[in-house]
């Protein structure tokens, strides 16, 4: 599609006519530099891990929680897509006798010639309530959640690599608005450094503001961590209970005093 030359210029032609002629130095500059002031605001002094669910008793609270849009099943949406394309799927989106247990990771065998048990395992992490309370904490726990899902499915967090999806309200001249993505990126960077795991960057969007009849609404500060790692397909653990008497284990995590993840505890 192109010929590499020693002119240090990128030239594009339409027929014999030059339509683009840019210097390599200009391309390397990545465009004009932009500067903005950012102010990271204080967070509300409350326990972000406790969410008040309405109901007089446990049964009512359970049903109320299941009606939360962030908890409800997305089976109808998932079934609109063919999860078997490519014949590489190791775990179907839903497992169990009734196919009602949702899988928390995506496991796909690598498309190589012949047979292989080598697969990729990918999971995402994001808590909108936590990110709304503090983008810094929310971004940090996005990485922890992605790692937790991979470990629960039989993968190794130590070999994970990440890419992020960011989504924030429309940026203005207000330093507090710029403080939200700044805080989220700092939280993400802190987790990557403490866990020793790298990210290749990600996709960002700063257009999450919408005009309605009652005014402008904004998306909550959003940083979703997508983590992927190689895995042997034979070692993958599906989430459904296999036999009567199977045990479920809770690996409890105690946050630090500032409510950030205790990565040293989690590593153990």
Segments predicted by a language model, with ranges:
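Glycine/proline-enriched, intrinsically flexible loops and inter-domain linkers
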Residues: 1-268
């Amino acid at each position: 599609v192109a010929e590499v030359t020693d002119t240090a210029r990128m030239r594009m032609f339409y027929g014999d006519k030059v339509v683009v002629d840019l210097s390599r130095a200009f391309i390397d500059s990545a465009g004009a530099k932009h500067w903005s002031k950012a102010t990271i605001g204080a967070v509300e002094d409350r326990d972000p891990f406790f969410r008040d669910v309405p109901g007089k008793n446990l049964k009512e609270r359970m049903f109320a929680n299941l009606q939360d849009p962030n908890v409800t099943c997305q089976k109808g949406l998932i079934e609109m897509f063919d999860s078997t394309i490519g014949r590489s799927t190791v775990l179907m989106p839903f497992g169990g006798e009734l196919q009602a247990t949702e899988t928390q990771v995506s496991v796909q065998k690598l498309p190589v010639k012949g047979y292989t048990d080598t697969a990729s395992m990918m999971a995402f992490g994001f808590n909108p309530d936590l990110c709304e309370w503090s983008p810094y904490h929310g971004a940090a726990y996005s990485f922890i959640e992605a790692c937790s899902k991979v470990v629960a499915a039989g993968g190794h967090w130590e070999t994970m690599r990440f890419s992020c999806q960011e989504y924030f309200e429309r940026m203005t001249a207000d330093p507090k608005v710029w403080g939200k993505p700044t805080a989220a990126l700092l939280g993400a960077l802190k987790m990557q450094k403490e866990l020793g795991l790298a990210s290749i960057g990600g996709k960002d969007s700063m257009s999450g503001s919408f005009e309605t009849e009652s005014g402008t609404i904004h998306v909550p500060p959003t940083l979703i961590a997508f983590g992927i790692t190689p895995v042997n397909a034979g070692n993958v653990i599906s989430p459904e209970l296999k036999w009567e008497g199977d045990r479920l284990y809770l690996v409890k995590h105690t946050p630090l005093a500032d409510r950030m993840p205790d990565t040293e505890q989690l590593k153990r």
